[in-house]
């Protein structure tokens, strides 16, 4: 997205990550979609001051290196150096949840607060911490990587290799997995009919089924909320 001086998002563009594939290809697509967003804003790249990159995993904001991102398969990826080859502007990288937390601090729900915590739910579970108006990065830039807190040692395996991590249950990915499991256990669930058009189960499927009075859908939502509360 393109953000103006008032911290307003004035244009957006998106593309699919299409994993797994080389990090260099993903970075090139990121540059293309950034330029598309600039075009959608009716601007030229010369009018843009800098480029910011938010990424899951541990990002060294000092060196511009994504040190480790298990969801993307990145290890010691020099994303800032590569991005500058595509867009010749100052470039910065930060953990995506940290970036979200700082965005809320300067222009959103945490505006006016000195300290704040932000939890992001998506492919994984991320955390961002603001203390005295500054991002708390912690040891090895992983101070708020709450998604890999183990809340059930006997739970399913996480992409990080451990079992029962917070994000195994409380991410959108985890919710989709639990929804599919519930559907196969209950062939009469309305969730089967909800996905007849495209055959895709989303993070909304169980919630929509619950609202329609579906027992299996409600059980999934109850389980999801239980683990979310436990993790928090």
Predicted features and spans:
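Gly/Thr-rich phosphate-binding beta-strand-loop-beta motif of the actin/hexokinase/Hsp70
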Residues: 1-10, 118-135
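Short, ordered coil/turn segments that flank beta-strands lining enzyme active or ligand-binding pockets
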Residues: 5, 62, 131-132, 153, ...
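Short hydrophobic alpha-helix segments
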Residues: 13-15, 70, 139
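Glycine-rich phosphate-binding loop and adjoining helix at the ATP-binding site
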Residues: 17-31, 35, 39-51, 57-117
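Adenine-nucleotide phosphate-binding core of ATP-dependent small-molecule kinases
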Residues: 18-47, 166-169, 176-177, 181-232
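Glycine-rich phosphate-binding loop plus the immediately following alpha-helix
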Residues: 85, 93-97, 151-189
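Structural signature of FAD isoalloxazine-binding scaffolds in flavoprotein oxidoreductases
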Residues: 142-145
């Amino acid at each position: 997205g393109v953000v103006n001086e008032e911290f307003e998002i004035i244009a957006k563009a998106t593309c699919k990550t299409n994993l797994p594939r080389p990090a260099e290809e993903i970075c090139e697509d990121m540059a293309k979609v950034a330029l598309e967003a600039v075009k959608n804003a009716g601007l030229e790249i010369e009018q843009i001051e800098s480029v910011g990159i938010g990424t899951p995993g541990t990002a060294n904001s000092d060196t511009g290196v994504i040190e480790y991102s298990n969801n993307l398969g990145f290890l010691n990826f020099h994303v800032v150096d590569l991005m500058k080859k595509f867009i010749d502007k100052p470039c910065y990288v930060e953990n995506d949840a940290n970036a979200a937390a700082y965005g809320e601090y300067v222009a959103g729900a945490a505006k006016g607060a000195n300290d704040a915590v932000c939890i992001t739910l998506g492919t994984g579970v991320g955390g961002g911490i603001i203390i005295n108006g500054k991002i708390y990065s912690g040891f090895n830039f992983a101070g708020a990587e709450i998604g890999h807190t183990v809340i059930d040692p006997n739970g399913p395996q996480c992409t990080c290799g451990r079992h029962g991590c917070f994000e195994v249950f409380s991410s959108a990915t985890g919710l989709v997995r639990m929804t599919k499991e519930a559907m196969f256990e209950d062939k009469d669930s309305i969730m089967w009919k909800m996905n007849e058009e495209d055959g895709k189960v989303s993070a909304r499927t169980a919630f929509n089924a619950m609202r329609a009075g579906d027992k299996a859908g409600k059980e999934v939502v109850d389980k999801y909320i239980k683990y979310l509360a436990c993790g928090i």
